[in-house]
């Protein structure tokens, strides 16, 4: 899982080739340049490709992290985690 510009590192390692991805809105063009074989999704808060997940920015990373909690532990665990954090999920 990458958050914000962490996707640029994944791009340089060619781990995003053939996948959809996102990053911070100010780095979308750089992501396209570094990973021409990825489909950049500029309006997505996060993209879950199964084994690789990319999140657009810091607050999107919170939504993405709660998504991972939900994927691994279920919806109830993600809801309880968000409530504990006093975070309103997108």
Task: Describe the predicted segments one by one.
Residues 1-90:
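Active-site-adjacent pocket-lining segments in enzyme domains
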């Amino acid at each position: 899982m990458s958050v914000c510009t962490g996707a640029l590192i994944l791009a340089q390692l060619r781990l995003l080739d053939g996948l959809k991805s996102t990053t911070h809105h100010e780095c979308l063009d750089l992501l396209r340049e570094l990973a021409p074989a990825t489909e950049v999704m500029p309006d997505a808060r996060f993209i879950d490709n199964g084994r690789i997940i990319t999140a657009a920015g810091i607050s999107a990373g919170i939504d993405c992290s709660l998504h991972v909690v939900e994927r691994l532990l279920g919806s109830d665990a993600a809801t309880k985690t968000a409530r504990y954090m006093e975070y309103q999920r997108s």
